[in-house]
Amino acid sequence: LKKILPESPIILKVTPVDPPEFFFKGWQQKVRIEQVFSGENLASGSEIYITFDRWKASVARKEMNLSFVNFMKDGAEYLVFLSESIGYTKDGIEVFQLPKDHAIASVFSYEVHDNVIYPVSGESTYVPYKEVSDNEFFAVDTEGLDAFLELKNFLLEKYK
């Protein structure tokens, strides 16, 4: 990802404007663009929605798949790598998506977070969200968390 993400057609620093909006089995979140590192026809101060094909939720099973990265929190700044507009607007605001071919959501907080590793066992890696709700990343061991943090630090140095 260190090589792939910097080649993304759209790289932005954003701040969430609203909490995530759930629809069908997924969600999207409205953000304000703070800085454009790459991408055409995008400007600081404008608002867009961000979505990801891998963000899934099942109300019946009480499960969410956040692609290893937590929701963006109000008032914080994030570095996001987007692939394209999905050709759809919500309330006149264009919707962009994270790259489909990545299992990990390409969203990185400019803040430092305390990440809790919640013990898992058996076949499932699902954990109670309330136990990890302040995390930036979700990992099952320190090796995985260290890899996320190394990638984050590399990217934040590049896109300050």
What are these regions (language model features)?
Residues 15-18, 34:
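Conserved positions in beta-strands of structured domains
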Residues 42-69:
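Beta-strand/loop nucleic-acid-binding surfaces
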Residues 22-32:
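Short aromatic-glycine-enriched beta-strand elements
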Residues 18-24, 38-39:
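Short, conserved beta-turn/loop elements at beta-strand boundaries and strand-helix junctions
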Residues 61-160:
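Netrin-like (NTR/C345C) domain of secreted extracellular proteins
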Residues 3-13:
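Short coil-to-beta-strand transition motifs
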